[in-house]
Amino acid sequence: MKYIVMQDVFFVVLLLVLAVPLGIYMYKVMIGEKVFLSRVLEPVERFGYRLMGVSEVGMSAKRYAVSVLAFSAVGFVFVMAVLMLQGFLPLNPEGMKGLSFSLAFNTAASFVSNTNWQAYSGETALSYFSQSIGLTVQNFVSAATGIAVLFAVIRGFIWKKQKTVGNFWQDLFRVTLYILLPLSLVLALLLVSQGVVQSFADYSVVETLENGAKQLIPLGPAASQIAIKQLGTNGGGFFGANSAFPFENPSSFTNLIEMLAILLIPVALVVMFGRAVKDSKQGRAIMTAMMIVFVIGVVAITISEQFAGPHYQGVATSGSMEGKEVRFGVGGSSLFAASTTAASNGAVNAMHDSLTPLGGLVPMFFMQLGEVIFGGVGSGLYGMIGFIILTVFIAGLLVGRTPEYLGKKIEPYDMKMVCLLILVPPLLTLFGTAVAVMMPSVQASVSASGAHGFSEVLYAFTSMGNNNGSAFAGFAADTTFTNMVGAVMMLLARFIPLVAALYLAQNMAGKSSVAASSGTLSTKNGMFIGLLIGVVVLVGALSFLPALALGPIADFFTTFK
């Protein structure tokens, strides 16, 4: 246990050390200031703008949102076409056939929405072309879209009397060129150096040591996709077993760098936020709130998995190792599970369906908090800003003062947008789960009975409704109902809050700042951090406690039998 504690502390410290300079760098990218890569990348940037016909004219929230939706729609159609027609496309050495309409629809929605829910196994269903040209490209642009929208939201708080929130095409291009591509290149090369596969060769047939039997070894351009899958909080694995597969995550060292990659940009964006609003204490307050909840979750999962459960009381064990890789152990698996669900990533290095009931409850609850404990790149922070405004609003009601945040007064219109930001994911999750448990096809998809069977369904629709993408793998996801309903859920959960965030940003940008007074609520002290955590957890608890009581909580009490 001491080793696990040391590992977790080292991880958090290293994460913060890496995130601070990256956050400062991203702030410079956001405001268009020169960075150390400018000499190399500025000519590429100018050429890209000329090629796409991009002007630097600012956009209103409506125009920005239309640009995001149109761009995403084109990506959706392209990915769906590639998946359905892959049998006729190049780079298909294994002769993979096109996906069914419902599966292609679900997969396209999943990757466009930055969810990366996978109802297929990559090595048996997709060609190299589909993986690299279809899905990997979406991993880049969906992540860049989230960060671009966050840039717009931040401008809403730092600009005064403005009618625009920035230019989507410029933001998208700069995020991709200056942030995601360089980081992904470095990480991909690092992964390849550690043995992660990067090849366009045919699958290999090898003779095993057991009776000379033949075995097919899948290959492919995995490292390049894994790099952006982690950095962009996408999470979709090149192989079916995701980061539990040795070709994706071969050692404890690659496990460390993949976990760092999952949280690096979300944490750095908080640093960037503090820099952008000219008050680092604001960023530190948000970081502290996120980190407190994250650490509590890591501790809860680790203890639950290390001590396995009441039925192992008095038995000497090394923890619950079912569904875990020996090379990672309980500590590496628990930290990964917390990281991937706190950050809206969804990659896994262990089977979450095999976690103990309380161990599985924590990742599920992280998602149900709205993916704001770090959350997805961009979307996590603008979701947390929604919770901050809600917290300020509640505090203002308590003391009878007009609430304000960063010098901008909070008005009824702002609260309407915040409600859309906060309430859409839980409503989609609960409605989807309620409908799903009544469907015979979903009931047949569940591998377990009783409380754990319900947990499998709840986890699946929580994951899709909050753009995470991980799953309790005992749930057979490739059914027409789950594919179609899940796709609609993922798109709505992504784009309704995104559009609401943009309109919130424009309304804030149009206001002038008001000077802080003695009655202004401080949003950077310990009291506010506690209030913020309370509001985030309370909204999650009130929304999901009844469902959790029927699932993982009831499942936990069955272990006393």
UniProtKB/Swiss-Prot annotation:
Pfam family, one: KdpA
Keywords per UniProt: Cell membrane, Ion transport, Membrane, Potassium, Potassium transport, Transmembrane, Transmembrane helix, Transport
Record-annotated membrane-spanning stretches: 4-24, 65-85, 133-153, 177-197, 253-273, 285-305, 380-400, 417-437, 484-504, 528-548
Similarity remark: Belongs to the KdpA family.
Function: Part of the high-affinity ATP-driven potassium transport (or Kdp) system, which catalyzes the hydrolysis of ATP coupled with the electrogenic transport of potassium into the cytoplasm. This subunit binds the extracellular potassium ions and delivers the ions to the membrane domain of KdpB through an intramembrane tunnel.
Oligomer status and interactors: The system is composed of three essential subunits: KdpA, KdpB and KdpC.
The protein's name: Potassium-transporting ATPase potassium-binding subunit
Name of encoding gene: kdpA
